[in-house]
Amino acid sequence: STLQQTASSRLGFGASRTMQIAQKLYQGIEIEGETIGLITYMRTDGTNLSKDAISDFRNYIKNEIGNEYLPENALNYSGKKAKNAQEAHEAIRPTDIIRTPQSIKKYLSTDQNKLYDLIWSRALSSQMESAKFDRNTITITSDNSDTTCKASGSVLKFDGFLKIYKNT
């Protein structure tokens, strides 16, 4: 699944470890005497979000991150289908965006917090503005035109979704 691939590349978690941790986050973690499911069903590669989730995400972005990070319209990824995707369910996301990874860290193991942070930030960033870069290219050619060297680089101008979903 996409979750397993992303957890492997970003966190170094194996597929079964990822799913065991996700299962626990889905079934519930005890927070202040109450067992709370922190993520939606995790055995899916679905990309659609419920209207309520989108509304909650957009309100959170506007109020907690900044209006400049909020696209004019909600972003929809339902047309993008992964090969062999299991899409009967909504995309994996936090059940309540207000439960930030930092706010519930003390209730989670280190690995649970890492995976929850990945799910939380990836889901929320899906409704944020794109990052903006300036791309520069320099070409140097020798006097006799025998040798040409080209170098390109990008400079981040606006962090957009990268503000919370770091590209590590």
What are these regions (language model features)?
Residues 1-168:
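Core catalytic DNA strand-manipulation module of type IA topoisomerases
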